[in-house]
Amino acid sequence: EAHPQAKKFRDYRELFDKEANNIDAVVVSTADHTHAPATSVALQLGKHVYCEKPLTHTVAEARTIAELAARAKVATQMGTQIHAEANYRRVVELVRSGAIGKVTEVFTWCNKGWSDGRFQPSANPAPANLDWDLWLGPAKSRPYCD
């Protein structure tokens, strides 16, 4: 390991319980359904937060995060890594300048094969090094499938 003295935590709540006084900021890159809870705790503790997308899964969670961030008066950012690249910035410039006319409709396409629920993998025991219940966090309980 590159940093053998680095402290490791299996649960973000344990990190905050033990190290809240020793940290100024956090990067939330946990399972996506735990982004809002982890970000909320960090903001309540007055920590700066960089959170991977999605920040939340519901409008209510987003409103809560916005309120907590405003109260904490800390820096926050949601990660949208590729959207900071030159090709995305160029499109924004073209739209804002009017070079392509008024945009009235946008169509998108995604080539990822997201499951529509028809494919149901069989359940397996979770690997020994994975705390499946902890990973599920606030998500609905379901069997582990590799």
What are these model-predicted stretches?
Residues 1-51, 60-75:
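N-terminal glycine-/serine-/threonine-rich beta1-alpha1-beta2 phosphate-ribose binding loop
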Residues 10, 83-84, 142-144:
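Redox-cofactor-proximal catalytic regions of oxidoreductases
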Residues 14-17, 93, 134-137:
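Charged/polar, solvent-exposed surface patches and flexible loops
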Residues 17-20, 97-100, 144:
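Surface-exposed acidic, glycine-flexible loop patches that form ligand/cofactor-binding
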Residues 30, 107-110, 139:
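Residues that line or immediately flank small-molecule/substrate-binding pockets and catalytic motifs
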Residues 48-52, 56-134:
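A contiguous active-site-proximal alpha/beta segment in oxidoreductase catalytic domains
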Residues 128-146:
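Glycine-rich, aromatic-lined ligand/substrate-binding cores of catalytic
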